[in-house]
Amino acid sequence: MKNYILFLIIGLLVVNTSCDSWLEETQFDKINSSTLYESEEGLEIGLNGLYGLSRRFFRFNDSDARGAYWFYCATDLAMVRTWNEAEMYRSNMRANAMPAEMWNRPYQMIDRASAIIDAAPGISMQTETRERIVLEARVIRAWAYLRLISTYDNILLDSIPTTPDNAFDEVEYKPASQKDVYAFIDRDLDYAIKHLQYKVDPGIIGLGLARQLRAESAMWQEDYTTAAAQADAIITGGHHKLVGISEIFGNNVNHSESLMAWQFDEVSGGSHTLAGGDGHVLGACFQARFYEITIPGDPVAPIIEEANYGGNAYGWTYPNEYLRSLYDKDKDKRLQFYFYPDTLYGNNPASAYYEKKLPGDPPYSTQLRQYTWSLMKYRDLSKPAKRALSYKPFIAYRLADTYILGAEAHWRKGNTEKALEYLNAIRLRAGLEEATTIDLQAIMDEYARELCFEGKRWFFLKRIGKLVEQVNKYHRFGSTTSSIQGTTMKDYMVRWPIPQAQIDAMGTFPQNPQY
């Protein structure tokens, strides 16, 4: 990747610290950076640093990570109130304004993964340990490439790690063919699938995640046979199982349904360079500030910042009425466990409405910041109520992803019986009756009901060719109940602009069309 990303990786060797396991802190300065890829200890630290870098890419807790958050908000299911609304199909969706880390950080991940993979064969260590390190690095590299190509379409492909010897070599920068990119992704994942195990510690890459990513790659390539086979293998593998609907986003998300969950720990954390990481604010982003509601005649707020109502919140983006319309309000259990209730009860002992239903019917305020339908998937009952930052692990992929992808893959292959079996596994858990027919709309709707605001629907809609249509129909902006409006997404916006600084640095690499 040479000099065009040299400035992206300068400093990684001196700031990335992580852990021998996710909850055991290891300071990077215990080993000299010059020997990072020359010993078993150095390779382990390099892998832990790679995990930390990857976690930082997928988590959201500051403006530097707003790109990851963007994908939660820019779909047909969202109503955006503030903060990053100008970047969504509006004035700031341009090459010098969009979050550059969505391009920069995956290439950092790729470069460091390649360094680990290349160095491992020359290091004296147990074969089993070497193999484990390489397998995990190859999955992370494939994951990074999969996110890059699904975001930008036109990307660079380079597996040679940057070193002081090659950093300033002359390179011709040109987009790789999508066929070559997917072939590279698949080689990494196919190798990993042959050797990984399903049972791994929380936050560590296992066979379930590798197969899920391989299935996604196959779906992008319209290879539905491979996608279906990978989904089948996860579902029948015996390790990953659907859990009760109340457990999915409960206090412990490291359960059998989780294929991969990013781990955080406040005791060993406080910075993205430490084992416990620097937390995230996903819960605060999707939840209204109920504690700002006022009731005429009551001198105090009826609701105070408290764990059951999510505590401190930002109230930036919410589920919209289109998403609500997809649920059976009388039967679907997900309304109870994925969202805060519409009807609120006072929890302030000083209020006249303590432990009583707030007067009138929802909405309790015309200000969406104070009250609107809110997501509960990322609620953290253990964090201080007056703090938005959470150290609760959050799920990157879960078995429900696999069931819905498998349903689509089998449906596209013409295997309606298996497609319905997989779709109905999700429906039955939610308390719904079995579906007897299946089509693309049924898959889209179940995906929305089950996987809303888990960060992947934008890519799903893009892949099936429905993104622009769905966003233009249903995506909403607004700050009050009377100011809610739609948006206009243009066809070229299905791919992000490449950061202008990168275009300038590479010189010969073309910008994506119409940016």
Please report, for each region that a protein language model flagged, where it lies by residue.
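An aromatic- and glycine-enriched ligand-binding surface/loop that stacks and positions planar moieties
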Residues: 20-78, 190-193, 208-355
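C-terminal motif of bacterial Sec signal peptides marking the signal peptidase cleavage site
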Residues: 16-18
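Conserved, well-structured interaction surfaces
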Residues: 40-58, 80-152, 175-180, 189-202, ...
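Flexible, polar/acidic helix-loop-strand segments at domain edges
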Residues: 321-398
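Long, intrinsically disordered, low-complexity segments
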Residues: 40, 51, 106-107, 166, ...
